[in-house]
Amino acid sequence: AGDAVAIGTNAKVLTGTSGVTSAARGIAIGFNANAQVASSIAMGNGATTTGTTGVANAIAIGTDAYTYGANGVAIGMNAGKGSTATSGNNVTVGADSGQRNQGTNNVAIGPGSGNDLGENVRQNIALGSGAGNQIKSSSGFADYNINGGKGYGHNISIGNGSGRDSDGNVNVA
């Protein structure tokens, strides 16, 4: 991988894996760190940046931190783990935060926050331990388009455990 750096036992910067963009300019630091997309940084034991063809610019820092999709940031132990948001643009900071997400353009700060966001969940902010989990946002704004679809989300959850199981748009908890 052009201009790639891998430091640590089993640290890898992948090139041309089926369905994954070459990780040119990728950096992998740590035991089993794995940079799979271009211009990405995977740092920590088992940290991984991955996605589909054309994905780039991801950062995963921490034991088993994980990003899937372009421009994603996951910082903290197990942050972002199990996420499948191909559009990316999610930011998660805190242990066990931002896990199993399918949504895009979301921010989660705090341990265990911003988990299990639905496929159409976009532009949510969760601040605090366990805030903003299981948001569904099932309806959209007719006049607001993101990537060709209706805009869903716009929920703000501040405080420990706030905003759980929200369903709809423009909620503040």
Regions found by a protein language model. Give the residues of each.
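Glycine- and small/polar-enriched repetitive beta-structure motifs of secreted/surface proteins
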Residues: 1-173
